[in-house]
Amino acid sequence: MRYPKNIQQGGTIGFVAPSFGCQIEPYYSAFGNAQKKFREMGYQLQLGPNCYAGEGIGISNTPEKCGQELTEYYCSRENDCLISCGGGELMCETMSHVDFERLKAAEPKWYLGYSDNTNMTYLLATICDTASVYGPCAAAFGMEPWHLSLTDAFGLLKGETKEVHGYDKWEKESLKNEEHPLLPYNTTEPRVLKSFLGRQAAGAGQKIQFSGRLLGGCMDCLVNLLGTRFDKTGAFLEKYKEDGIIWFLEACDLNVFAIRRAMWQMEEAGWFRYVKGFLIGRPLCFGQEMMGLDQYQAVLSVAGEKNVPVIMDADLGHLAPMMPIVTGSLAEVRVCDNDITIRYDYR
């Protein structure tokens, strides 16, 4: 696994828009304030040509232009890391126009983004053997003040963070809108983890610890990549089978039945054959129940059969805040009741 160099004080942060750009509010103002904050912190900035573009469908521009931007800016020596402008809908089409041979030959650099950016973070690990950070996109850094999760994410890029913890509360409903683009997360809900060992719920005060190599992202994107020419998951699993895999997964548009279908699909594709544990984020359909199926049984239908720890409702994904996850890194996870710690090991 290749680990990028840390961004140094005074270094250059690059911004790209392989999914949505920051053309409309509240993202336009939030991205502008993020740039202001980074400059005040002493960093140089390099903006890709699509950061404010809105010509594309489900992404900032045409797939060709988005793929070209992503390839050129990742391989460029004029920036030291890349932060994606945002998530979106069709970044998979961007990846058809990314030159992965150039990415593999380039000096690795940190790439930060989540949601649709799974198309980059997952493929960097499985195709390019390069670590990246599954975490907040550029506009989030415009909030006033920063949430601790943003400090943690930027700390990973700087090399100052090697351990992340769960956050006290999470956001059920965002207050950020066109009139209030810089509002921080509206954290009102206490963090309550649902921990299982196989199908058995963990007891009060029970300490759970497991380690392995982190792989995963947004399930919507992962099952879309599965079986395509970009799916090199099998080779990755064999290379790192002695480490075992910690699968981190979260869902955006999937309802509870779609989550269960996604888990079945990944299981039948052999993706979970060396699993050491699951980290499951709060799904956007949090609290949904359909025909007797809830978000927990949707996951446990497969994960519960593996006799490994399954930690659900973790700070991960579309219901902020999220612990930034270093995709491809070795990690040790420690859980007790509602407390969770992830310690990264760059080997």
Residue map of PLM features:
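Conserved anion/nucleotide-ligand pocket segment
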Residues: 133-220
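Buried hydrophobic positions in well-ordered alpha/beta secondary-structure cores of metabolic enzymes
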Residues: 15, 82, 116, 222, ...
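ATP/NTP phosphate-donor binding region
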Residues: 1-78
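Short, acidic/small-residue loops that bind anionic groups at enzyme active sites
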Residues: 98-124, 131-139, 309
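Structural motif
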Residues: 81-83, 112, 246-248, 279
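Oxyanion-binding "anion nests"
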Residues: 213-252, 256
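Long, hydrophobic/aromatic-enriched structural stretches that serve as scaffold segments
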Residues: 75-98
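C-terminal active-site/capping subdomain that shapes the small-molecule cofactor and substrate pocket
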Residues: 256-347
